[in-house]
Amino acid sequence: MLCVIAKLDKRSTEKLTAIQRAAAPDADGKPLHGHITLAAYMGEDEAGFMAFCAALLKDVSRFAVNYTHLAVLEETSIVAALAEKTGTLAALHRRIAEVYGSSLNEWTGSDEVWLPHTTLLYEPKADLPAVCRKMAADFAPFTAGIVGIEFSRVTPPGYEI
């Protein structure tokens, strides 16, 4: 699976990491890679998809997103910081989904199901509502900077940026 991700600035990644570590210091041992997934492509023509995205993104510079709250996404066993589905972020996702929606995964294939977020913890066996409440004690809504758009590849057991 080939993903298009919006990369967070260092300050925002550090802020989310601090929230994560305060509530789950042992987490899964991996550093937080601050990003929001715009699209997860599962089709056959990766070169065409990448060329389309590169053309779409060529004039996109830094932009802001607003993180509003934390939530448990039970279907995927994660605690996430949720961002507003507005502005440049939403426009980019919408355009990719319009053209490639049928080749995107179930979570990014349409505007109706896409939920822009940054995963803070993936732990299927944890009491995620309790962890989320603990993280929420250190969370306040904030504006984050998006400093670039990148491709990443999901490969067992992880991903490559």
Which functions belong to the PLM regions below?
Residues 70, 75, 146-160:
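Glycine-rich beta-strand-turn "strand-cap" elements at beta-sheet edges
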